[in-house]
Amino acid sequence: MLKLAFITSHAPSLTHFRGQLIKMLCDKGIQVFTFAPNFDDETRMAVQSLGAIPIDCSMSRAGMNPFVDILNTWQLARLLKRIHPDIVLNYFIKPVIFGSLAAKWAGVPYRIAMIEGLGFIFTPGPTGFSLARRVLKRLVMLLYKLGLSCADKVIFLNPDDQNEFIAAHLLPPSKTFLLGGIGVDLNKWPFTPPVVESLTFLMVARLLREKGVEDYVNAARIVKKINPQIRFILLGDLDDNPGAITRSEVQAWHDEGIIEWQGHVPVQPWLVQTSVFVLPSYREGVPVSTQEALAVGRPVITTDVPGCRQTVADGVNGFLVPVHSPELLAEKMITFMQHPELITSMGLASRQLALEHYDICKVNQRLIQLICSKTSKCGQCPPSVAAS
């Protein structure tokens, strides 16, 4: 029986983003193990219900102590040796680097890494990269080079990240595979007619500055001076990352009446009540929140940056704006106020884009082909695919 191990630094992502893939693999007779730190009972049971075996491992999601990382990598390698997986798939920054090393040390035959996005270290601020961020970026690039040297295939979600890694000589082009977005279940996210008469904008993101939260708020201020009745919803939880928005900041915006902050709540009920989805992020992999908005048929305003530009055909299903540009963001919002018919036509175009590029069933089939392409144990899998 083919054995496959997922390694992640965030246990809930196994069900939220990999659940359908894990179930498809288990249904094919593949034995799936999932390594993550800090499984809670709910996530553990959810993983087991998919047919996989959850295994706790030590991994600091954001810590930067090299001795702790080396110790955790050695312990992870020991765990991998016990189960002898044929394939390991690592995703998120720490697993990509240290999970790939551990898999190499453990003698795993086929090692896959997935770059879901490059994060704040690779994201310039309004004045460019600070000295500290440049130093940190260089260090992370060296770690990526070390980790990716232990990977047989590296999956990218957008071509900008792929090209940046190749240009930096972190890996050869032959090792790369361009997937696109991870996709959404189009049956669970069906098209719904967008709200036209009561114009409502929605942003869904972790409350980080690099997600463009402040740009969204400043654009809302501009638009509300013209029409105070327009609503601006913000969904997302507080975060402990360096670029986090504080509770006092977001609460002040909420109390001011600029935005309606709902915190961490289910997204779908809010999406169906909105007119236009907005994500002025500084950089992404390919954001799942935007893919969900496309699926239900909402126009999208987002930034012309890696990962975001892949979700919008400018002027067809929404608009692209420059990063750090709340005035131009407000201008596009006002366009929907002045031309409400665009909400419907662009919403239909968004749904079509989701059907063509972000169907999770099609995406997972490509992943399964890649996973099974280097082993003879997976007779049920489709033929191997070439690197994109």
What spans do the regions from the language model cover?
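Donor nucleotide-sugar binding/catalytic pocket of nucleotide-sugar-dependent glycosyltransferases
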Residues: 55-56, 137, 141-191
